[in-house]
């Protein structure tokens, strides 16, 4: 069959399948599966580009990491005025009820504050205090927020909180953690901790020793080096890996580290924290301690100038994400954050033993999504997350900077942006209405941005103050925008359907409907997800199914 005829045949096949879907979703699934992979490759082929695929205006300036929602929390100035949303009432834009506009007042009431909304700092610290288990959530003991669920969440986040340096919030350089020394002669643990490097450790002292001994490993080519490094990265725990060239545009303009001070805990121990937890729990209000700020000087803090960035992705559990916004969905996010640090540390040690400098990073040091796009791992979606072909947005990103020159991968396009233009499901599912409903992304201007956004790049607007306000109200991270995403599937044929639908005019309006016809995602409306019992049923399924659903 000629290529044109084959293309037409497949288009007709998909159109017929779509029409039949209304009558019989299960039958269509059987019809479509054998066809969609070929159809997607012909109608919507995956392409590579040598240039960064999104517009970056000449006015673009590097992002200050201390402006992001969670790092801004620890700026005392953010505790002086009420938290501000970019749009006070998004119902004027969406035509739907604004389910997020009252969150600042509700969060203030949760803190015992009357007569005003919560500040930015109060909002975020309310979230952190509940998330760390120091304060019960308002849903405590409901299905998905029980002591069992919360214990799983604590275990999942433990490495990130205790050994990574709490770098999930951003910052840099590297990480520091408080540890309690032990007397090896008496086995007594000290009451006072000391600050030491965490897993995101930039100590490259071993590299010079390897080089001085003439033991630096020499690769035959950049291509061979990339192949070996990718293989090692997968073995050490990554699910996906790509190589990006070092691009200074994505390095934060300011690095920062939260200032920790000693806080006396009820058990008599001193705990170092970036906010005064005992004062808050006793009703004395919220107090934070600010930042230590650093110029982004690679040679000073890491001993080298990066040439390449190893960017890797860790999958989050499909069944756990389906329970969003429950604590179970937070647990798989926490597991990935904990694993990010472990895997990044192991990659860094591997490189150092070969005689190359390395700086392992999580959300700190630089913006992960554009680096992952450059590394060919996916596209940037409406929800601001990286959409991969295999996991959709259901993953976390980490990276390791190195002076080893590697052959970079190329950005790939497989239909995500075209699909996001049509779908808007994540925007509809957001309890805070933080995600733009505009059809097309655009190069954002300063007036389009809330304080945590960086203007002059092409994307959809996101309001992190709205998002963070719901996290505080919920007492746990929310992953609704991930859970309902049509790319969040363990069967990749659905992704092929999405790619095809964006390219055929008659199917475009139905693009987001395919997975709904096939029974995926549950309710999109955030209130209905809870009120219908869907989230509660997904939590029960999670605990009752001993084997995880894997890709």
From Swiss-Prot:
As recorded in UniProt, its EC number(s) are 1.21.99.5
Task: Name the domain of life this protein comes from.
Answer: Bacteria
Q: Which UniProt keywords apply?
A: 4Fe-4S, Cell membrane, Cytoplasm, Iron, Iron-sulfur, Membrane, Metal-binding, Oxidoreductase, Repeat, Secreted, Signal
Describe the temperature profile of activity.
Optimum temperature is 37 degrees Celsius.
Q: Which reaction does it catalyse?
A: trichloroethene + chloride + A + H(+) = tetrachloroethene + AH2; trichloroethene + AH2 = (Z)-1,2-dichloroethene + chloride + A + H(+)
Query: What does this protein's record comment on cofactor binding?
Result: Binds 2 [4Fe-4S] clusters.
Task: State the post-translational modifications.
Answer: Predicted to be exported by the Tat system. The position of the signal peptide cleavage has been experimentally proven.
Residue intervals of the 4Fe-4S ferredoxin-type domain: 411-440, 478-496
PROSITE patterns under this entry?
4FE4S_FER_1, 4FE4S_FER_2, TAT
User: Under what conditions is it induced?
Assistant: Expression is highly induced in the presence of PCE and TCE. Located in the pceABCT gene cluster that is flanked by insertion sequences including transposase genes. PceA, pceB and pceC are cotranscribed. PCE-depleted cells grown for several subcultivation steps on fumarate as an alternative electron acceptor lost the tetrachloroethene-reductive dehalogenase (PceA) activity by the transposition of the pce gene cluster. Exogenous vitamin B12 hampers the transposition of the pce gene cluster.
Top EC class of this enzyme: oxidoreductase
Kindly list the GO CC terms recorded for this protein: cytoplasm; extracellular region; plasma membrane
Q: Which GO terms describe its molecular function?
A: 4 iron, 4 sulfur cluster binding; metal ion binding; oxidoreductase activity
Q: Where does [4Fe-4S] cluster 2 bind?
A: 430, 467, 478, 481
Q: What happens when the gene is disrupted?
A: Chloroform inhibits the growth of the wild-type strain, but not the growth of the PCE-nondechlorinating small deletion (SD) and large deletion (LD) variants, where the former fails to transcribe the pceABC genes caused by a deletion of the promoter and the latter lost the entire pceABCT gene cluster.
- Give the pH dependence: Optimum pH is 7.0-7.5.
Positions with a binding annotation for [4Fe-4S] cluster 1: 420, 423, 426, 485
How activity is controlled: the entry says: PceT is required as a chaperone for prePceA maturation. In the absence or presence of exogenous vitamin B12, the intracellular corrinoid level decreases in fumarate-grown cells and the PceA precursor forms catalytically inactive, corrinoid-free multiprotein aggregates. Exogenous vitamin B12 is not incorporated into the PceA precursor, even though it affects the transposition of the pce gene cluster.
| Signal peptide span | 1-39
Q: Which cofactor does it need?
A: [4Fe-4S] cluster; corrinoid
- Sorted alphabetically, which Pfam families does this protein's record hold? Fer4_16 (PF13484), TAT_signal (PF10518)
Q: Where is this protein localized, as stated in its record?
A: Cytoplasm; Cell membrane; Secreted
The family annotation for this protein states: Belongs to the PceA family.
Q: What does this protein do?
A: Catalyzes the reductive dechlorination of tetrachloroethene (PCE) to trichloroethene (TCE) and of trichloroethene to cis-1,2-dichloroethene (DCE). Can also use various chlorinated ethanes such as tetrachloroethane, pentachloroethane and hexachloroethane. Reduced methyl viologen can act as the artificial electron donor.
Q: What NCBIfam families does the entry give? A: RDH, TAT_signal_seq
What is the name of the protein in this document? Tetrachloroethene reductive dehalogenase
User: Species lineage, top-down?
Assistant: Bacteria, Bacillati, Bacillota, Clostridia, Eubacteriales
Gene it is expressed from: pceA
């Amino acid at each position: 069959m000629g290529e044109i005829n084959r293309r037409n045949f497949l288009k007709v096949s998909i159109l017929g399948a779509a029409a039949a879907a209304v009558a019989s979703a299960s039958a269509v699934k059987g019809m479509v599966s054998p066809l969609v992979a070929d159809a997607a490759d012909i109608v919507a082929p995956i392409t590579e580009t040598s240039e960064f695929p999104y517009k970056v205006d000449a006015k673009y300036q590097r992002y200050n990491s201390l402006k992001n929602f969670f790092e801004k929390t620890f700026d005392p100035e953010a505790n002086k005025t009420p938290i501000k949303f970019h749009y006070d009432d998004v119902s004027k834009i969406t035509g739907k009820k604004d389910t997020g506009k009252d969150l600042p007042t509700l969060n203030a009431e949760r803190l015992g504050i009357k007569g005003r909304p919560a500040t930015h700092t109060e909002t975020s610290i309310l979230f952190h205090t509940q998330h760390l288990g120091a304060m019960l959530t308002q849903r405590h003991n409901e299905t998905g927020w029980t002591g069992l669920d919360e214990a799983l969440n604590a275990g999942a986040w433990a490495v990130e909180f205790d050994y990574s340096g709490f770098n999930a919030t951003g910052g840099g350089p590297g990480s520091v953690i408080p540890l309690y020394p032990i007397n090896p002669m008496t086995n007594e643990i000290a009451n006072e901790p000391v600050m030491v490097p965490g897993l995101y450790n930039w100590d490259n002292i071993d590299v010079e020793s390897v080089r001085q001994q003439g033991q630096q490993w020499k690769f035959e080519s950049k291509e061979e080096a990339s192949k070996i490094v990718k293989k090692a990265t997968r073995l050490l725990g990554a699910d996906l890996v790509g190589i990006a060239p070092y691009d200074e545009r994505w390095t934060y303009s300011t690095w920062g580290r939260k200032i920790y001070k000693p806080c006396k805990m009820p058990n008599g121990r001193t705990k170092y924290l970036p906010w005064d937890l005992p004062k808050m729990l006793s009703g004395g209000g919220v107090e934070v301690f600010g930042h230590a700020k650093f110029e982004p000087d690679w040679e000073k803090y890491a001993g080298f100038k990066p040439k390449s960035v190893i960017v890797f992705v860790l999958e989050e559990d499909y069944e756990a994400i389906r329970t969003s916004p429950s604590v179970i969905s937070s647990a798989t996010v926490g597991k990935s954050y904990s694993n990010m640090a472990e895997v990044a540390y192991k990659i860094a040690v591997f490189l150092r033993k070969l005689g190359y400098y390395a700086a392992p990073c999580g959300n700190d040091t630089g913006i992960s999504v554009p680096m992952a796009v450059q590394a060919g791992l996916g596209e940037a979606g409406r929800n601001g997350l990286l959409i991969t072909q295999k996991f959709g947005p259901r993953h976390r990103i980490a990276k390791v900077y190195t002076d080893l020159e590697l052959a970079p991968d190329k950005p790939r396009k497989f239909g995500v942006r075209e699909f996001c233009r049509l779908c808007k499901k994540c925007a509809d599912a957001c309890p805070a209405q933080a995600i733009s409903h505009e059809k097309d992304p655009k190069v954002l201007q300063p007036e389009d941005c809330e304080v945590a956004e960086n203007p002059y790049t092409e994307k959809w607007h996101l309001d992190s103050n709205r998002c963070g306000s719901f996290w505080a109200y919920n007492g746990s991270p929310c992953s609704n925008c991930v859970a309902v995403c049509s790319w969040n599937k363990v069967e990749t044929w659905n992704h092929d359907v999405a790619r095809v639908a964006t390219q055929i005019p008659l199917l475009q309006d139905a693009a987001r409907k395919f997975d709904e016809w096939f029974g995926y995602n549950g309710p999109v409306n955030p209130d209905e997800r809870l009120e219908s019992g869907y989230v509660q049923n997904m939590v029960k399924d999670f605990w009752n199914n001993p084997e995880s659903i894997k890709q």
